Regions:
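Contiguous segments within soluble domain cores/interaction surfaces
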Residues: 17-21, 88, 101
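Sec-dependent signal peptide recognition
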Residues: 1-3
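C-terminal motif of bacterial Sec signal peptides marking the signal peptidase cleavage site
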Residues: 7-10
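C-terminal amphipathic alpha-helix
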Residues: 31-47, 51, 122-170
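Short, solvent-exposed, charged loop/turn and helix-capping segments
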Residues: 92-108, 125-127
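Immediate post-signal-peptide N-terminus of mature secreted/exported proteins
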Residues: 13-80
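Extended amphipathic alpha-helical interaction segments
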Residues: 57, 64, 94-97, 101, ...
Length: 170
């Protein structure tokens, strides 16, 4: 009997129950914004590399990098608009022939991966789950950083192969 009374008392204890107003809804986007600080690692704009390749006027790539930089601020209210803009810029870049020595399968495939990750992130803005959007955006930035890294290392690899070919031909 004592145990039964104790169980009933604990169920009626209003101090331990959470009181939530029936009209109050907590949006998962807002709770995410309030509870977490999210940092996306965006690689620096490869200005030196682009200048050495004679591509400092490559406007499509500048706009693409600016879109990713804007998205890294992660204003959850505008994330869908930012991703839509980013997807458009990625389509523009992928439709055109890449300049200089960048039109190779290694760069083209990484560009496609970035485009796919942007589409995936757009999907998660519509069918939002608190952790899935952030995870998807992290993968988007990893993919973009891999693209830029590959662009910069491709030049070094081409130079090394050229040096090897010159030595073999002598």
């Amino acid at each position: 009997l004592f145990l039964l009374l104790m169980i009933l008392q604990s169920c009626n204890n209003t101090d331990t129950n959470q009181l939530v107003s029936p009209g109050l809804k907590v949006d998962s986007k807002d709770s995410l914004k309030l509870n977490q600080v999210i940092n996306f690692n965006l690689i620096e704009y490869p200005g030196v590399f682009l200048k050495s390749e004679g591509l400092e006027e490559w406007e499509d790539f500048k706009k693409l990098h600016e879109s990713l930089k804007r998205l890294s601020d992660l204003n959850l209210r505008d994330v869908q608009v930012d991703l839509l803009s980013l997807s458009g810029r990625l389509k523009e870049v992928s439709k055109k022939t890449l300049p200089g020595t960048l039109e190779v399968p290694q760069i083209r495939s990484r560009l496609k991966v970035v485009e796919m990750q942007a589409q995936k992130s757009r999907y998660f803005t519509q069918y939002y789950r608190e952790d899935s959007l952030i995870l998807s955006l992290n993968k988007l930035y990893e993919s973009y950083n891999a693209l830029v890294s590959r662009m910069t290392t491709l030049d070094a690899e081409n130079a090394a192969v050229s040096q090897k070919n010159i030595k073999e031909n002598q």
